[in-house]
Regions:
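Short linear motifs in intrinsically disordered
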Residues: 2, 90-97
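Phosphate-/polyanion-interacting regions in eukaryotic proteins
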Residues: 76-88
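Boundary at the C-terminal end of the N-terminal hydrophobic targeting segment
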Residues: 22-26
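Alpha/beta-hydrolase superfamily serine-hydrolase fold, recognizing
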Residues: 27-40, 46-58, 65-74, 96-354
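Bacterial N-terminal signal peptides
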Residues: 11-20
Length: 354
């Protein structure tokens, strides 16, 4: 996540070219908006973007604070180390705000955390959720941050999966691990009583796993939670061009070693229907909830996949939050986070096993 002042200027280049960050930062702030266009349609836009008045005061304060802790380019090792620090802090905060029991386990040979609500209604003992954490496929940014609040709010058991990470284990290793856990849970739960969800990389995996299960002829889960995802590794959505800017919340810095997409994709065809579910047969998909926000780098990709689900005749819901960056629901102090988590939990209660 990156830092945003109340009023700042930014130079956008809506193309696949790299952004000239140093030059943009050295230029004086413009007094008004302007735009020029190349013959190929590339836009060069100078904008003045004020702090949005349409979000909570807590969210405004948070966005303002992001200016002061913007990480620069980093190696994979540095990214993992930084992620481990804030994940531990945020996981502890999650467990304080949303009390649950957490037990380390191994499920189908895969490391998992079994997250159980302190008080689980009898009707929920036959329902379970699988959480696939975010982290760009190469680190763990949310195994407990995602699973703990949902287990507490939905009053359901959550199995959080520590799937194998790239680049050491590129696609389809993570999919295979998640499928193995799902198959193991099928021994104890009806498929319609299982839900799968995740944020960012975990959201992508949730869709990929559903496609893989369909290919394998296995029964599909009762619901999918796809919280800020892409479903096409062969093309870049518009919001990824728009928000991949230094200093603008929503940016995700690639590592210095290799682009994180390349690390995960490996040698797989980028239009492989499991890797990129947009190219799969999506008919018969479970009821799905997609959540994003207007400053999410994956806003475009999330909405593109939502439309694909609708075109295939599926029950798909899309919730778009105002003016907040990628995976903002990791930040528990925001009223918008409480609303987002409540929406997710309600969806699973209404769809899983119903």
């Amino acid at each position: 996540m990156h830092r945003l002042p109340k009023k700042f200027s930014l130079v956008l280049f809506l193309a696949l070219a790299c952004i000239a960050i140093a030059a943009a930062q050295s230029n004086p702030a413009p007094s008004q908006d302007s735009a020029t266009f190349d013959p190929d349609g590339t836009a060069h836009i100078t904008r003045v973007v004020p702090m949005p008045a349409t979000i909570s005061t807590e969210a405004q304060s948070w966005l303002e604070s992001l200016e002061h802790t913007t990480p620069g380019p980093e190696t994979l090792a540095e990214r993992r180390a930084r992620t481990d620090v804030w994940r531990a802090q945020d996981s502890a905060e999650a467990r304080k705000l949303y009390p649950v029991n957490v037990e380390e386990a191994t499920t189908a040979g895969v490391r998992t955390d079994i997250i159980t609500p302190l008080a689980m209604p009898a009707e929920n003992k036959d329902r379970v959720l699988i959480n696939l954490h975010g982290g760009g496929f190469n680190s763990d940014s949310g195994s407990l941050i995602e699973g703990v609040p949902i287990a507490n709010l939905a009053k359901m058991k959550v199995v959080s999966v520590y799937y194998r990470l790239a680049p050491e284990n590129p696609f389809p290793a993570a999919v295979d691990d998640a499928v193995a856990v799902y198959k193991e849970l099928l021994k104890s739960y009806k498929p319609q009583n299982i839900g799968i969800f995740g944020t960012s990389a975990g959201a992508i995996l949730s869709a990929e796993v559903a496609v893989k299960l369909k290919q394998l002829g296995l029964p599909l889960p009762g619901a999918l939670g796809i919280f800020s995802a892409l479903a096409d590794f062969s093309r870049v959505g518009d919001s990824r061009q728009l928000f991949t800017l230094n200093g603008f919340p929503g940016q995700m810095q690639p590592t210095d070693e290799k682009h994180l997409d390349d690390q995960y994709v490996g040698k797989t065809d980028r239009k492989d229907p499991v890797l990129s579910p947009l190219y799969a047969d999506l008919s018969g998909f479970p009821p799905s909830l997609l959540v994003t926000s207007t400053r999410d780098i994956l806003l475009s990709d999330t909405t593109i996949f939502h439309r694909a689900l609708l075109r295939s005749g599926n029950n798909s819901q899309l919730v778009v939050f105002e003016a907040l960056p990628h995976a903002f629901w990791y930040h528990f102090q925001l009223p918008e986070t409480k609303e987002a988590l409540g929406t997710m939990a309600k969806f699973f209660d209404e769809k899983v096993g119903r």
